[in-house]
Amino acid sequence: MKKGFSAITVLSLSFLFIIGTGCQDSGTFAVAGKTGTLGYGGELIVGLGSDIDVRAGINKLDFDVDEIDIEDIEYDFKANFDTMSGLLDWHIFDDSFHLTGGFYSMNNEITLDGRPTKSVDIGDISYTPNQIGSLKGKAEVDGLSPYLGIGWGNPMRSNRRWGFTLDLGVIFTDSPDVTLSSYGGTYSSDPTFLAELEKERQKIEDDLDVIQFYPVASLGLFIRF
C-alpha cells in the first residue's frame, strides 16, 4: 500500500520537475475539480509541446450503507477509496479529443459487518446465528495500476480560461484480497468452524478474481492560470 503511494508520488514529482521549464516558458497551467466513479478530487494540468498534456491528480470516494439483507445475513457496508494519478494526454484529430495513458495508485477498501438472522452455511456446514456471532469481512485493492482511456477537453489550449472536461477509461487492477473473521459467537474460536470460515473466505476471493478492472467516468471543471 505504501509502496504504491510512494511510486505515484515520485512519478508526479518527476512530471512536475520535467515540465518546470515548459511552465516558465508558457506561464500557464490549469487546475481542475473532478467528480465521477472515483469520487471527488482535483488535478494539476501542464502542457508539454503542442499536443501533449501531463496531469497529476487525487480522488476520494467514501460511503456506507446499513442493514442490507443478503442471504439471511444483515450487513453494514462501508467503502473507502483513495486514488492518486499520473496521466499523459495526447490530443489528436482536434484540440479537444485525446487519448490518455498513465497510472493510478489505488488504496481501495470495502468492509462488511454481518449478523446472521437464521442458520446459514459457512463453508460446507450450517451454523446458527448464536454459533457464528458477527462476521467481519474486508476486500482490498492497492498498489500501482495502469490506465487507458479517452477524453474530451483541452485546458491548456482552450479559447477560454475555464471549461469542462470528460474522461472515460479503465484502470487495470489486481483482484481484491479478502479477509473474513468471526467474533462474539460460541464457535468463533472453534478450529472446525475456523477451517470452514477459511473455505468461505477463499470462495469469496475466487469469485472476485474476475474483478480486475475499475471503470472510470469523470466530469471536470478547469480553470487556466
Where is each model-derived feature located?
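Outer-envelope beta-barrel architecture signal
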Residues: 23-29, 50-52, 95-97, 144, ...
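Outer-membrane beta-barrel strand-turn architecture
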Residues: 48-50, 92-94, 154-158, 225
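Extracellular/periplasm-exposed beta-strand and loop segments of Gram-negative cell-envelope proteins
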Residues: 58-86, 108-145, 174-216
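Membrane-embedded beta-strand positions of outer-membrane beta-barrel proteins
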Residues: 31-33, 44, 54-56, 88, ...
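Transmembrane beta-strands of outer-membrane beta-barrel pores
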Residues: 35-39, 58-64, 103-109, 154, ...
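Outer-membrane beta-barrel "beta-signal"
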Residues: 89, 93, 212-225
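Cleavable N-terminal export/targeting peptides
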Residues: 1-26, 209-210, 225
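Hydrophobic, lipid-facing positions within transmembrane beta-strands of outer-membrane proteins
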Residues: 29, 38-42, 52, 82-86, ...
